[in-house]
């Protein structure tokens, strides 16, 4: 599984560039990549190795790459950046085929998301379009329903804590230069 997720923002007034509020690429958008891997593999990484480039002025991760090992041959390679051209993908490659999701995390308002599906042994790509939606309005609605007890939340605080442990392991690996075990 490969997940690049990048955007450009070098505004010192933006909280995503503030070290004191856990800004930077890993905290801001790396969590989306980690979540994608955990949901797809239905597991938590066992080991991680990471490389991080800090912005000299902000002291936040402006570029981070990590390899997350979920065991049993399941790996997620992610690259996130807050100072690169806007780009995002999720690519899943396996023995039976592959799936590529264009703009999986935040497509432009109302824009459809395209899925490309290829079966093993075929060069043909099947295209599936997911209709556009206002994802932020949907998130607010889902939150309101959860607060009112109408529906469960999509993720728990325990789930968020697991993601944070994975992200902190990426930082520890980048600092130590070694694989970190979770």
Residue ranges and their predicted role:
Residues 90, 108-121:
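Short polybasic amphipathic segments
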Residues 32, 138, 159-162:
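A non-catalytic, amphipathic alpha-helix used as a structural packing/dimerization or gating element
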Residues 1-57, 177:
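Predominantly a Rossmann-like dinucleotide-binding segment in NAD(P)-dependent oxidoreductases
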Residues 34-107, 130, 137-151:
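Contiguous beta-strand/loop segments that form the cofactor/metal-binding neighborhood of enzyme cores
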Residues 71, 128, 145-182:
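C-terminal helix-rich "cap/oligomerization" subdomain common to oxidoreductases
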Residues 21-28, 125-134:
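A short glycine-threonine-serine/GTX helix/turn-capping micro-motif
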Residues 5-9, 98, 106-107, 123:
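Active-site/binding-pocket entry motifs
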Residues 68-72, 116-123:
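Short acidic, glycine-rich loop/turn motifs
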């Amino acid at each position: 599984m490969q997940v690049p997720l990048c955007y450009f923002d070098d505004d010192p007034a933006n909280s995503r560039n503030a070290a004191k509020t856990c800004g930077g690429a890993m905290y801001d958008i790396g969590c989306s990549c980690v979540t994608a891997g955990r949901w797809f593999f239905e597991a938590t990484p066992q080991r991680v190795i990471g490389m991080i480039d800090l912005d000299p002025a902000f002291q936040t991760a402006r570029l981070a790459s990590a390899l997350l090992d979920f065991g049993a041959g399941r790996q997620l390679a992610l690259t996130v950046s807050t100072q690169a051209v806007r780009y995002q993908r999720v690519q899943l490659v396996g023995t039976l085929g592959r799936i590529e999701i264009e703009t999986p995390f935040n497509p432009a308002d109302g824009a459809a998301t395209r899925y490309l599906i290829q079966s093993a042994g075929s060069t043909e790509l099947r295209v599936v379009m997911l209709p556009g939606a206002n994802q932020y309005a949907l998130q607010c609605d889902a939150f309101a329903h959860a607060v009112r007890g109408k529906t469960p939340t999509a993720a728990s605080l325990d789930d968020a804590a697991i993601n944070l442990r994975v992200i902190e392991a990426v930082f520890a690996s980048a600092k130590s230069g070694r694989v970190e075990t979770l």
